[in-house]
Amino acid sequence: MEEKHYEKTRDRRSDAGFFRCAAIVIPYLNPAELAAISCTSKSLYQISKTITSRRTSDASRGSENLPIPFLNPISDDSQPYSYFFYTPTQTLRLRPDFRQAWGSNDQSRLCRKEGRPDPFLLRVEGASGCECASCNGDCCPCLEADEFLLTRECGPSCKCGLGCGNRVTQGGVTVRLKMVKDEKKGWGLYAAEFIPRGQFVCEYAGELLSTKEATRRQQTYDKLASITPALLVVKEHLPSGNKCMRINIDATRIGNIARFVNHSCDGGNLDTVIVRSSGALLPRICFFASRDIQENEELTFSYGDIRLRPNGQPCFCGTATCAGILPSENT
């Protein structure tokens, strides 16, 4: 009897150890790997199902202020969510073997504990900033906006903190959003509440690339019809007028919910704004509402001028000005 009791106790401990390990390892699996292990046992099937449900409930993995769920109304579609690595801010190039947990039980708690990542990838040593305690008025020297859709905010060289009124883009998403799948366009980002004109929506986050690397990747993406790229190129014209700074952000593999914003040939309802912060070396690309946006309305912007290509991807924006083909960066 004692021997049988010992064996049962040992088996229970073994099972408990297995499930603890599974809870740690399985969130790192991609959808194909998750589907494969779910077929091996009832227990792993339930674990995989739970992880899928958590992934569907929040694309941001708890990194944003509000959950951003996936909603798939296509009944015969087997993909309840889109798999990608998440970063709420700019990041450097990833290692090829990079993995990221998604769907663990305590992921949201860990994100809150660790806090939001520093939005400034590189800083300017010795840069001067404002001395304001909280820049809620128009007197802050950092506060500036112009007709070229360039905004200046307080940054790492300023005395104020994240609660400053001139740091609206640095605290993450503050409006309710959702991902909805369309039969033609695939996943798109939608407003889950009314968004007033001028409201900050989200940053365009992803890998910050050199122009050489961005050109190489774009040429690769052009050849691979199976990949839907999310490489954004924005050119900031310098005061001289005859030169420009090119900003290349690739959210194809790692990015945030901005990677799901689809193109609209009529310009869409979002403005692409270059945001510079005092003491930060590099600007950030952010989306602001260009007009009032209604609840359940899709968020869109213009990818740029149409470049006619024989193998160009079709456009399904459905606007009266639709050109029938998506813009593509001229490399």
Residue ranges: model-predicted function:
Residues 1-118:
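Skp1-binding F-box subdomain of Cullin-RING ligase substrate receptors
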Residues 7-18, 27-37, 125, 147, ...:
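Amphipathic alpha-helical protein-protein interaction segments
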Residues 9-12, 30-32, 115-119, 138-142, ...:
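Eukaryotic intrinsically disordered and solvent-exposed regulatory patches
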Residues 34-38, 47-49, 53-57, 140-144, ...:
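Intrinsically disordered, low-complexity regions enriched in proline, serine, glycine
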Residues 113-173, 299-300, 305-307, 312-331:
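Cys/His-rich Zn2+-coordinating "finger/knuckle" modules used by eukaryotic regulatory proteins
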Residues 167-276, 281:
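Catalytic cores of histone-lysine modification enzymes
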Residues 195-201, 293-300:
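Generic structural signal for buried aliphatic residues
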